Amino acid sequence: MKSILLLFSLIVLGSATEEVSRTEQTSTLFSVEGEIALPSTRNCAKWSAGARIHLNHGQYMGFVRQDCTFRVDFVPTGTYIVQIENTDFVFEPIRVDITSKGKMRARKLTILQPNNVNTLPYPLRLSARGPARYFRKREEWRITDMLFSPMVLMLVVPLVVMLILPKMTANDPELKKEMENMQMPKVDMPDVGEMMANFFGGSAPAKKKAVTGGSGSGQRRK
């Protein structure tokens, strides 16, 4: 009889200890809550059905209510990255720090500059950055693409230099004198007007050279 009572008391004591530990554990768990701001053209009640709230890439997960609010329960102390998983909009992830006393501190997640702290208000308010794009927009043809192509630049730049350089030399006597002192060989610059006329109007007829023969060249010597 005594052994039965002793066994019963041990069972009751073990269950009570387990219940106390569970109570202490649940008392140290917290909730992450906030609100989602969508564009005015989108109905939140329909959008919320396919949206999920992920903490640390799915370690803890919550759902979005029809009024665009959310709450993730039973979250222990630590640092978490809050993300909104959906197929329609792009949201920036937010970092949330939960202290042992239950104090929530939210800030922007800056991977490139971790020392840069931009605090955010709590409860969270997440705004859509823009619609999600799964395809790259097709590039349109523009006239500037043709004008700045390498082939066009190779043709236009030398032509511009040929037209501007003689005018600059004629208007600046000092530059013209320096060019003459350099004793550079004179290069006949082509006439642009004549070149264009030959290109569009056809080439000018070639001049016939007079052929004269000597009197003694065609006769045989005797």
From Swiss-Prot:
Residues 1-16 form the signal peptide. Residues 167-222 are cytoplasmic. One of its GO terms (cellular component) is EMC complex. InterPro entries: EMC7 (IPR039163), EMC7_beta_sandwich (IPR019008). It comes from the Eukaryota. Its main location: membrane. The chain crosses the membrane at residues 146-166. Pfam families: EMC7_beta-sandw. It is found in: Membrane. It is a single-pass type I membrane protein. Keywords: Membrane, Signal, Transmembrane, Transmembrane helix. This is ER membrane protein complex subunit 7 homolog. It comes from Caenorhabditis elegans. The lineage of its organism: Eukaryota, Metazoa, Ecdysozoa, Nematoda, Chromadorea.
